[in-house]
């Protein structure tokens, strides 16, 4: 199974994970998408096109996108523009996708719904050995959530609280796993 995790922001983090042996997660590719100097609808169009052209070319079984966070009202409009461009590109491409709220991501990775970015980075490294930017680590957690949901054989590797959140998230997105 191939899963893409996306952390929408002005530097959108992405991580491709595969379950290659039924026992571990394999990082295919990771990075950030940004368009310095572009603003507004030009940036929205560029992000949507990049998602269609580059990332969807991997033909993922599932894409997990971080849901909208409402903590910073100053960046909310920009994040909604970027998030909408990503979701529209996925919809137009017919790629199955699901959203995970920021608190769900944090609880899955760390067991705490209010973990800061540097804490998420540390937890991702400790549990899975992945190092990257804060955006890439969020994307890793999202991709891992989707991969564990789609590959029950990986489930024993999770802690009890991770398993609980995973099963609740999977129930919310059951249409993707039937």
Please place each PLM-identified region on the residue numbering:
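Phosphate- and other anionic-substrate recognition elements at nucleic-acid/protein interfaces
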Residues: 1-178
């Amino acid at each position: 199974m191939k899963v893409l995790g996306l952390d929408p922001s002005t530097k959108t983090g992405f991580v491709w994970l595969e379950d290659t042996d039924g026992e571990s997660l394999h990082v295919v590719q990771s990075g950030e998408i940004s368009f310095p100097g572009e603003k507004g609808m030009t940036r929205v169009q560029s992000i949507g096109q990049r998602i269609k052209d580059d990332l969807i070319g991997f033909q993922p079984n599932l894409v997990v996108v971080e849901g909208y966070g409402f903590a910073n009202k100053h960046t909310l409009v920009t994040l909604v523009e970027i998030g909408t461009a990503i979701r529209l590109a996925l919809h137009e491409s017919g790629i199955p996708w699901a959203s995970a709220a920021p608190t769900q991501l944090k609880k899955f990775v760390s067991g705490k719904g209010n973990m800061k970015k540097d804490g998420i980075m540390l937890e991702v490294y400790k549990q899975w050995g992945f190092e990257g930017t804060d955006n890439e680590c969020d994307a890793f957690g999202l991709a891992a959530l989707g991969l564990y949901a789609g590959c029950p054989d990986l489930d024993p590797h999770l802690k009890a609280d991770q398993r609980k959140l995973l099963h609740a998230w999977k129930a919310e997105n059951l249409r993707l796993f039937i």
